[in-house]
């Protein structure tokens, strides 16, 4: 008898098939899961081909590469990381994140627009997450009910579907293009209206700027239109909760790094922010600071009520504590060291701009 056959036998000599084990040991919602998504499956095939000497090209890259094919690493970041004190390398970080990191990451997300937004009565806060994916997960887990649908653009990053499934929600989509304009306003308005008929909360993940996988970025006019549509939907449905989540994972390499900060600043100055509308940013240091494996991100939240922002922090922290416990301290300290030192910041900026031009 083969070892695997012996291992599959129970104490009474019963031989179990994989199908029987899955049916017995795994609840239905778990048995349908697969660990490797399409991206990582093809990455494994590329690595096998390369190792065997074949002339293979990696088309699955979720990171920045030099023209030589080597991983792009910002030397200012890697040097600063290695300079951190033992405490920063080994100690836990506070569950919400290091205080100076939480302040800094809001500026990284919104730029000069942040102070304007805050000046006009919009309160902001941020919490650390393990990469941008952690922020996406937190929003899906807490801003929709199980069984609800999340609104995405038709063409989107594949793992959005994985995160949605893990949170027990489905997906709805609106077009990536609007014909002669960037935004299909009619389709977006219609989809929001339909979702509000079916559920009490609406959450949309909008990957902009530098949309993955197309690289497209909305213009300032298109951003204003999209924000206006969400604000109108909230105003017209005061008993529904509306959240626009801006996934800015690649914002550092777009032409308008802080375009959404500028758009929100204009909105805060000129318009009434509905109390039932939340705007959130998903920040990721994976690309902006080439810290792919350090898993450093943040969820930034904007709302006109300070007490509600504080409540959101507590809600999101509960999810983080019960899912990944806490996020790493070292990358938070590294980013703060870079952005609080003029020479390091300028060096980081030069390298980021070089990578942007590749």
Language model features with spans:
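Hydrophobic/aromatic beta-strand patches that form the interior of the parallel beta-sheet core
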Residues: 57-59, 151, 172, 245, ...
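Short aromatic-enriched loop/helix-cap "lid" or pocket-rim segments at secondary-structure transitions
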Residues: 69-74, 256-258, 293-295
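N-terminal small-domain helix-loop-helix segment of the aminotransferase-like
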Residues: 3-5, 11-18, 23, 29-130
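Conserved core segment of the aminotransferase class I/II
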Residues: 3-7, 13-14, 104, 269-356
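Conserved core of the PLP fold type I
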Residues: 85-244, 251-273
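Short alpha-helical segments and helix-capping/turn motifs at coil-helix boundaries
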Residues: 38-45, 134-139, 189-190, 282
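Short, solvent-exposed loop/turn segments at secondary-structure junctions
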Residues: 62-66, 70, 157-158, 209-212, ...
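Active-site donor-binding loop signature of nucleotide-sugar glycosyltransferases
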Residues: 61, 174-178, 284, 329
